[in-house]
A protein has these predicted regions:
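Sterically constrained small-residue positions within well-ordered secondary structures
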Residues: 7, 12, 49, 84-85
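Classical Sec-dependent N-terminal signal peptides that target proteins to the secretory pathway
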Residues: 1-18
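Cleaved targeting-peptide boundary
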Residues: 17-26
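Short, non-transmembrane amphipathic alpha-helical segments
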Residues: 67-88
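A short interface-forming secondary-structure element
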Residues: 57-71
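Polar/charged, Gly/Pro-rich intrinsically disordered segments
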Residues: 26-61, 86-151
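A short linear-motif detector with a strong N-terminal bias
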Residues: 22, 36-38, 69-74
Length: 151
């Protein structure tokens, strides 16, 4: 009986995915974005909490409105964000255009994005319709984590 319990415990440890803290997630996401061909200029990564939960936010610099940038950014956050010790509630992508154009923001529920980009459990059209929203977003600096304040 003890051998069976030990076997299942050992198997579950091997099969579980590693979990990382905010600094590691930040570093992994930055490296991942830099390795993607055609990924826009990465301005910054923010990890913070709001009333709804934890948020992972990418700020990118773009010259044109290209929906592929939204997919690339959300996919990168999904692939890396799934490994956070404390799960994220939302993924936010802010596209910064040359002056005087106002930045545009996109947000997605993190579980929904992970189910689309990583687990392939939902189709693209459902993710776009049910999970992705396009709006101008404002960050509250007081919500930023210490990691982002000390840059």
């Amino acid at each position: 009986m003890m051998k069976i319990i030990t076997f299942f415990m050992f198997t579950s440890i091997i099969m579980s995915k590693p979990l990382y803290g905010d600094k590691q997630i930040y570093s992994m996401l930055k490296n991942h974005c830099e390795m993607i061909n055609g990924f826009p200029n990465l301005l910054d990564i923010h990890i913070y909490s709001n009333k709804e939960g934890r948020v992972l936010q990418l700020d990118i610099e773009v010259d044109i409105n290209n929906k592929n940038y939204v997919f690339m950014g959300m996919k990168a956050m999904s692939l890396i964000g799934q490994y956070s010790k404390i799960p994220f509630h939302k993924f936010i992508l802010i596209e910064h255009y040359p002056e005087p154009k106002i930045p545009s923001g996109f947000e997605s529920d993190s579980d929904c994005a992970i189910n689309y980009f990583v687990n392939k459990k939902i189709p693209e059209n459902r993710w776009i319709k049910d999970c992705l929203s396009n709006s101008i977003l404002q960050r509250k600096i007081e919500n930023w984590s210490k990691l982002n304040k000390n840059k």
